[in-house]
Each structure stands twice: as structure tokens, then as C-alpha cells.
Amino acid sequence: MAAPGEALTQSGYIEHHLSNLSLAKLGMVADETSFWNVHIDSLFFSVLTGMLFLWVFRSVAKKATTGVPGKLQCFVEMVVEFVADNVKETFHGRNPLVAPLALTIFCWVILMNLMDLIPIDFLPYSAAHWLGIPYLKVVPSADVNITMAMALGVFALMIYYSIKVKGLGGFAKELALHPFNHPIMIPFNLLLEVISLLAKPLSLGMRLFGNMFAGEVVFILIAAMLPWYLQWVGALPWAIFHILVILIQAFVFMMLTIVYLSMAHEDPDH
């Protein structure tokens, strides 16, 4: 929310809710376009949700019993089994990192996405009136910096394992001689393969960002256009539908990560 006592127009309300708490807003860097401008709120909530995932799963793992499990242990085991089954079906290489990575991505993205279901004014209003924080966006996955950082991390792993499994020569050969295995077509092959390669992290990060940002904008528009006592009329149906979006986007991000890493482990002569 805005500073206490400050009235906002409808357009001002929307613009305010789409503004991150950044170093530029605090006057610590020159402007919003600076390379060193960090979105503090997105970074904070992404780390917070990541730590929540680690704490819950570590606690369950430490207290796991072979007897009758509790509800939380059953839920965690269900999630782990679901991810493990998808990894077995999709990943055709041998790498002990892939399943834990897929589990981390799936749960972390879900937790970040779930922040979108918190009433739109609750945390920003509380932060403004109790902590004096003028701007607060609480959905990390609605920030392109977060989603693209995750996508680039997956991309870096894909390149690393492509070179490790196939060798630098094998990786270069894959780029230069596919899809047309003829020396004269190398420039054309390189153009196609490099574009295809760079499109992977771009589509991975932008898909998650686009869906979550759109969902956040709908909640903001509902809050801006309706009085507070009627907001639930529009927000509740959208929230129910949005739960499906939250889960699907986490699943898609996880599955594409597994697919990309599986491609990196493929036999170069496949």
C-alpha cells in the first residue's frame, strides 16, 4: 500500500501494486534500469519459500517412521513419489542430481506461486503501516528476474552436462551437423541449433512469469474496481481457477527441466 494517509487513484493503486521494493526505490542505485538494481521483496520471498520447503522436508525426513505415518509424512511421500515417477519416465540418463533438483523446483515454484493467493492488500498494507515499507510485491514468480534466473540455472546445467557427457567435440558436432549432416550446411545448422538452444531458457522463464504475472494483475484489477466488501465475489472464483494454474505451471517447469537434462545426457549418435 501507499504511505499511511495517502490516497491512491484507481490507476495509481494498480501501478503501486505492480511496483517492487527495489534498491532504486530506496535511492541506493541510480535508477530502475541499473544492472545493480535488486528487487528486494522478490529476493526475500523467494528465499523464504525456499527455506520453508527445506525446513518442512528436512523435518519430515528426520522424523520419518516405518510405522503408521502422519498426515504430513504421507503428503511428503506422495510428492516425492510423484516426482520420482516422472523422472523415471522422462529422464533416460543416469544422474543422481536430477530427481532432487526436480523435487526442489516443483515444490519451490508451487510455494512461490501460492503467494498469489494471499489477499492482495494484506501484506503490502501491513508492511506499509507497521514497518514503513512503501512497496511490496509478494509473488516471486511474477517477477521476470526470478523466473529467468531459475531458467538460466537450468540452462547452465544443460550446457554443463551436454559437454560432460558428449565431450566438447561431441557437443560442437551436435550443433554443427544437425539436422543436416553435411559440411556445406554447417552455418545453417549452427543458426538453427543456437536459436533453438537459446529459446529453451527464454521460454522456460517467460512462460512461468507470464502466467503468474497475469494472475496477479487480475487480482489487482478486482481489488481496484470493486469495494472491499465485494472483492470476494470476483476474487474467490478466480482464486479457485488460479490454483490449477499454480500447480500446472510448477509441473511444466519441472517437466521441462527434466526433459532438457535428459536431452543433455543423450548419446550424441542417437
Swiss-Prot record:
Q: Name one GO cellular component term.
A: plasma membrane
Q: Name one Pfam family in it.
A: ATP-synt_A
Per its UniProt record, what InterPro entries does this chain match?
ATP_syn_F0_a_bact/chloroplast, ATP_synth_F0_asu, ATP_synth_F0_asu_AS, F0_ATP_A_sf
What Gene3D superfamilies does the annotation carry? Answer: ATP synthase, F0 complex, subunit A
Q: Which family does it belong to?
A: Belongs to the ATPase A chain family.
The portions of this protein that span the membrane are 37-57, 98-118, 143-163, 217-237, 239-259
Provide the protein's localization: Cell inner membrane
Gene Ontology MF annotations: proton-transporting ATP synthase activity, rotational mechanism
Function (record text)? Key component of the proton channel; it plays a direct role in the translocation of protons across the membrane.
Q: What's in the keyword line of the UniProt record?
A: ATP synthesis, Cell inner membrane, Cell membrane, CF(0), Hydrogen ion transport, Ion transport, Membrane, Transmembrane, Transmembrane helix, Transport
The answer, when asked if Transport is one of the entry's keywords, is: yes
Concerning PANTHER family, the annotation shows: ATP SYNTHASE SUBUNIT A, CHLOROPLASTIC
According to the lineage, what is the superkingdom?
Answer: Bacteria
List the CDD domains: ATP-synt_Fo_a_6
Partners and quaternary state?
F-type ATPases have 2 components, CF(1) - the catalytic core - and CF(0) - the membrane proton channel. CF(1) has five subunits: alpha(3), beta(3), gamma(1), delta(1), epsilon(1). CF(0) has three main subunits: a(1), b(2) and c(9-12). The alpha and beta chains form an alternating ring which encloses part of the gamma chain. CF(1) is attached to CF(0) by a central stalk formed by the gamma and epsilon chains, while a peripheral stalk is formed by the delta and b chains.
Q: Which NCBIfam families match?
A: ATP_synt_6_or_A, PRK05815.1-1
Keyword flag Transferase: no
Membrane disposition: Multi-pass membrane protein
The entry's protein name is ATP synthase subunit a
Main localization of the protein described in the UniProt heading: membrane
GO BP field: proton motive force-driven plasma membrane ATP synthesis
